[in-house]
């Protein structure tokens, strides 16, 4: 049953538009909200519900009702997501566009207000010039003197910015984890990122990142839901990666490094889930942003490692593009300048890695190694490296790839000064111009401070190898850097204290004497006491520091090692048996190792087989368990879906029943109210306040209305009758009094009309005279111009006539030319048509001739065919005649044989009488006696045939000859069936001289008729002559059927 008309979406939309037209937008929003969130709306068609939703979101944006919009959009998504996803996208896009438009309008309004305030400020009126600085103005200036723009934005723009942010968050919540709305979800997320970047909303950006992160985490949790996203799908994962890369770019632009690092972790997690390799252009962006993050966090080691990975990716992309194995869309476009810049940054970042640790805690004394190890492992995984990077490994990799040749010259010189030819006494002089060049580049300027730390570390390490103590002034002179990168003595002392705290330096500062003393106690070396102190350093290799000479501490520490080596060499030369014993022990160990290797190998193989079997068994059990679990889960899901479907169906039915009942009650109440209102407004005298709606019905209201209308009609008739009587008397009195004043009024009217006529006539005459005078004056003025006008008109006419003649002649020439061309065209066309007609006539004649020839050929063929058929027919006729003759001869022979057999049968009584040979008759095919024979009753067919032939006689015998007694013809057997002509129906009068020809065929006579024709049929041995004593003349002709009464008449 369709919903009632007043709850259709079209009617709701019309009602809302009417409320908006009268300025009641909140009421219209309430109407739309109630309709959208109603359960009845689920059965409405989407095509009629979409305009309602568009108007609904428009009103929500205008009135800033975010919560109402969220409720309505959630309901609309649940209704339309299974039928039409496009309409959801249309509504949500409209929602976002309206919110963005409101923000733009608010900004324009704020700019207008600010410009008006700025323009009005200089020209403001001051009441008292001596009291300009009142306490109120001072307080206002203190509080908001320079904040007028901010206050305007907070009052006008900020509420709409908040609403726009709520819009983005609402749309993302509606679209989350829905595979059918995934593209719209990603598009909205990108728009939200641009919103945060455009308006520098850092707090909202953090919340947005957390929101998207929660959505991805919940995707696996709700994977069993309908339309859930599948991160295993490559396209879905690619869209999420694109969104995260945009998130990373915006985080870097907003300088939210913590969020950028978390975005990097999100990207790494998604990349680990992806089955297809990421594009080189995406990974280049990934490593570039990761390098910037590490640089901001002052983690120069991983910053250099990220730049190294970035350079490797650029080199691979350039090689792929050069080989034609990739596209420019998937690989970043790289030029030679880009490669040089990247190589310079890789080398410079590697040089900026601190030689000693820059952290504030001491690794050997505080248990932070495990935490630092876990952190380094995480960062290594983000870079996709197998092991944590080190300074030496990065330099080795850079040298192997030839980065020194690609890098800029000043970077190459810097590498040679710091890593190849480091001289502490001239380091600052050599490096000053290089630092100036690096400082002039804004991108490289940030590496100056870590380079200074590396230079100071190298400086103090090599000074400690050469000197035991140096003056502070000497150190300050050595550590001179160019402006503006100059470092102060306090900075140098702070660096020394930090190195000593970490155990990387062993230096004492004596401010009284102004001397730096390097620790020379051979048993108190910080490195010797705390060998794990380098755990937190970026440099853990022993040979990384350039060794000018061994320090006393190293000499003391390595003394036992040198002594052991010397004694070992001495023993080898002094006692040869010592070397032999060593060799024998070595050979014995090798033999034992070889003997045990095979056994160990077999045990290893057996253990491997056992492990593989256990793994296979565990895998099979796990797969079986997973399949069983999936089966149970699928069955449970199906049961839940069926139960939910049944529950929804039952609820829908109950709701429909309740809705129909409620609608019927509501319609009835509305109809009653409508009738009461009509009764109240249309009929007077009825008090409806005392009526109860529950006790009323339509019939009672109709009766009340009719009764009241009848009452009013009677009252009206009475009033009309009374009023008409009063009006008649009054009108009669008025007319009687009026007759007295009519003549006087007529004379006055005539006088007024005459006066008006005279005034009008005088005015018309005066206007005519004035116009005449003006016309005469104008004629006198213009009469002086008549000669000039005539001459000018004559000249113009002559010129126009000459031009006309020229154009006429030209037109005639053109006409003649076109006429001749047309004549030629017509002649050509006629000639062509004539040729076509002749050609057509020729083709027609040829076609007729061909048809005539074909007809003649067909006729000849037909005549030939007829002739052939006639010849064949004649041949067939001759053949048929020949066959007929043969058949006649065969028949004659059969008849003769039959006659002989009959004669032999009849010759049993009188053997001496031999029957004469019957004349040959036309032979016919034998007839079969199909009637059954029982007990010898009735003659056989041979007997009947013989009787027939005997009854027929021979035509050659003379008619007057008397037959011999022995040759008396037997009485013919009565035959049935057969037509007797009228001239043969006389019976006894028929003469036997001209018997009728015997029929060539014999009809079948049923047994019953044969028995009915003769009560005592002749036996098989009875002769035809003994069956009847009647003369031959009284018998009918043989072969013809004679009725029984005819036979009886003939017998009589």
UniProtKB/Swiss-Prot annotation:
Ranges of biased composition (kind: Basic and acidic residues): 617-632, 794-901
Recorded coiled-coil stretches: 92-121, 580-906
Domain PCI: 339-523
SMART domains: PINT
GO cellular component terms given for this protein: cytoplasmic stress granule; eukaryotic 43S preinitiation complex; eukaryotic 48S preinitiation complex; eukaryotic translation initiation factor 3 complex, eIF3e; eukaryotic translation initiation factor 3 complex, eIF3m; multi-eIF complex
GO MF assignments: mRNA binding; translation initiation factor activity
Keyword check for Iron: no
Superkingdom field: Eukaryota
Positions of disulphide bridges: none
Entries under PROSITE patterns matching the protein: PCI
Bias type Low complexity, positions: 905-927, 948-964
Keywords: Coiled coil, Cytoplasm, Initiation factor, Protein biosynthesis, RNA-binding
Bias type Polar residues, positions: 1013-1028
BP terms from Gene Ontology: formation of cytoplasmic translation initiation complex; translation reinitiation
Assembly notes: Component of the eukaryotic translation initiation factor 3 (eIF-3) complex.
Role this protein plays: RNA-binding component of the eukaryotic translation initiation factor 3 (eIF-3) complex, which is involved in protein synthesis of a specialized repertoire of mRNAs and, together with other initiation factors, stimulates binding of mRNA and methionyl-tRNAi to the 40S ribosome. The eIF-3 complex specifically targets and initiates translation of a subset of mRNAs involved in cell proliferation.
Family: Belongs to the eIF-3 subunit A family.
Name by which UniProt lists this protein: Eukaryotic translation initiation factor 3 subunit A
Protein species of origin: Aspergillus niger (strain ATCC MYA-4892 / CBS 513.88 / FGSC A1513)
């Amino acid at each position: 049953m369709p919903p009632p008309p007043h709850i259709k979406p079209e009617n709701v939309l019309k009602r809302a538009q009417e409320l908006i037209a009268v300025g009641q937008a909140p009421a219209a929003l309430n109407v739309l909200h109630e309709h959208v969130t109603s359960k009845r709306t689920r059965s409405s068609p989407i095509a009629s519900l979409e305009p309602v939703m568009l108007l609904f979101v428009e009103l929500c944006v205008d009135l800033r009702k975010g919560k109402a919009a969220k409720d309505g959009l959630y309901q609309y998504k649940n209704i339309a997501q299974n039928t039409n996803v496009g309409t959801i996208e249309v509504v949500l896009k409209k929602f976002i566009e309206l919110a963005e438009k409101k923000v733009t309008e608010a900004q324009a309004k704020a700019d207008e207000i600010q410009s008006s305030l700025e323009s009005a400020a200089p020209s403001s009126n001051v009441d008292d010039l001596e009291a300009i600085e009142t306490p109120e103005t001072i307080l206002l200036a203190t509080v908001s003197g320079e904040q007028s723009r901010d206050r305007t934005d907070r009052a006008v723009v900020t509420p709409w910015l908040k609403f726009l942010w709520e819009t983005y968050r609402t749309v993302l919540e509606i679209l989350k984890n829905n595979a059918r709305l995934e593209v719209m979800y990603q598009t909205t997320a990108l728009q939200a990122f641009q919103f945060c970047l455009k308006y520098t909303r850092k707090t909202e950006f953090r919340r947005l990142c957390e929101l998207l992160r929660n959505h991805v985490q919940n995707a696996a949790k709700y994977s069993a839901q309908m339309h859930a996203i599948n991160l295993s799908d490559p396209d879905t994962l690619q869209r999420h990666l694109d969104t995260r890369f945009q998130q990373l770019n915006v985080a870097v632009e907003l300088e939210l490094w913590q969020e950028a690092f978390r975005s990097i972790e999100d990207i790494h997690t998604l990349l680990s889930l992806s089955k297809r390799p990421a594009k080189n252009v995406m990974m280049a962006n990934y490593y570039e942003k990761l390098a910037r993050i590490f640089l901001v966090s002052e983690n120069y080691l991983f910053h250099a490692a990220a730049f190294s990975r970035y350079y490797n990716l650029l080199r691979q992309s350039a090689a792929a593009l050069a080989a034609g194995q990739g596209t420019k869309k998937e690989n970043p476009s790289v030029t030679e300048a880009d490669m040089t810049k990247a190589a310079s940054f890789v080398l410079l970042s590697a040089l900026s890695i601190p030689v000693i640790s820059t952290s504030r805690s001491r690794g050997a004394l505080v248990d932070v190694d495990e935490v630092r190890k876990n952190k380094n492992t995480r960062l290594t995984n983000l870079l996709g490296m197998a092991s944590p990077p080190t300074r030496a490994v990065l330099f080795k990799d850079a040298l192997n790839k030839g980065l020194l040749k690609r890098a800029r010259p000043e970077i190459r010189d810097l590498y040679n000064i710091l890593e190849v030819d480091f001289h502490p006494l001239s380091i600052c002089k050599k490096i000053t111009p290089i630092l100036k060049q690096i400082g002039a580049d804004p991108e490289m300027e940030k590496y100056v401070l870590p380079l200074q730390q590396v230079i100071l570390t190298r400086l103090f390490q090599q000074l400690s190898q050469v000197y035991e103590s140096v003056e502070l002034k000497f150190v300050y002179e050595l550590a001179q850097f160019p402006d503006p990168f100059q470092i102060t003595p306090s900075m140098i002392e702070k660096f020394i204290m930090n190195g000593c705290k970490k155990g990387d330096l062993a230096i004492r500062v004596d401010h009284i004497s102004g001397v730096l003393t390097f620790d020379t106690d051979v048993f108190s070396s910080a490195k010797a006491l705390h060998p794990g102190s380098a755990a937190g350093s970026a440099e853990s290799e022993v040979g990384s520091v350039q060794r000018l000479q061994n320090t006393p501490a190293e000499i003391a520490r390595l003394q036992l090692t040198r002594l052991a080596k010397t004694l070992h060499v001495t023993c080898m030369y002094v006692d040869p048996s010592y070397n032999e014993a060593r060799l024998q022990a070595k050979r014995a160990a090798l033999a034992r190792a070889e003997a045990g290797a095979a056994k160990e190998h077999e045990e290893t193989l057996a253990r491997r087989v056992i492990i593989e079997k256990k793994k296979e068994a565990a895998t099979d059990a796990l797969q079986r368990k997973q399949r069983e679990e999936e089966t149970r889960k699928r069955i449970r899901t199906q049961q839940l879906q069926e139960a939910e479907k049944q529950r929804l169906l039952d609820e829908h039915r109950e709701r429909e029943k309740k809705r129909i009942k409620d609608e019927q009650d509501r319609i009835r109440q509305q109809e009653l109210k409508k009738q009461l209102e009509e009764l109240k407004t249309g009929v007077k005298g009825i008090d409806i306040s005392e009526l109860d709606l529950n006790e009323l019905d339509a019939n009672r209201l109709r009766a009340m209305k009719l009764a009241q209308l009848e009452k009013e009609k009677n009252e009206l008739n009475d009033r009309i009758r009374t009023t008409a009587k009063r009006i008649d008397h009054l009108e009669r009195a008025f007319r009687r009094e009026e007759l007295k004043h009519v003549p006087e009024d007529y004379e006055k009217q005539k006088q007024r009309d005459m006066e008006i006529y005279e005034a009008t006539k005088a005015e018309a005459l005066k206007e005519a005279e004035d116009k005449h005078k003006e016309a005469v004056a104008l004629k006198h003025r213009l009469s002086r111009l008549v000669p000039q006008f005539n001459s000018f008109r004559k000249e113009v006419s002559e010129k126009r006539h000459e031009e006309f003649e020229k154009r006429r002649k030209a037109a005639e020439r053109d006409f003649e030319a076109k006429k001749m061309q047309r004549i030629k065209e017509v002649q050509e066309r006629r000639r062509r048509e004539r040729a076509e007609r002749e050609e057509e006539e020729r083709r027609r004649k040829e076609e007729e001739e061909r048809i005539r020839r074909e007809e003649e050929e067909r006729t000849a063929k037909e005549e030939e065919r007829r002739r052939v058929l006639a010849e064949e027919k004649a041949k067939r006729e001759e053949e048929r005649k020949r066959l007929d003759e043969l058949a006649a001869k065969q028949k004659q022979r059969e008849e003769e044989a039959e006659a002989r057999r009959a004669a032999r049968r009849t010759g049993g009584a009188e053997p001496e009488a031999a029957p004469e040979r019957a004349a040959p008759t036309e032979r016919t095919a034998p007839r079969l006696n199909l009637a059954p024979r029982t007990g010898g009753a009735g003659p056989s067919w041979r007997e009947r045939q013989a009787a027939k032939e005997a009854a027929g006689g021979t035509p050659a015998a003379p008619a007057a000859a008397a037959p011999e007694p022995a040759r008396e013809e037997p009485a013919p057997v009565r035959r049935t069936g057969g037509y007797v002509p009228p001239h043969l129906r006389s019976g006894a009068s028929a003469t036997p001289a001209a018997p009728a020809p015997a029929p060539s065929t014999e009809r079948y006579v049923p047994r019953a008729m044969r028995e009915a024709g003769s009560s005592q049929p002749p036996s098989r041995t009875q002769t035809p002559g003994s069956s009847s004593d009647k003369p031959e003349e009284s018998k009918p002709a043989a072969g013809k059927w004679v009725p029984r009464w005819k036979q009886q008449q003939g017998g009589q």
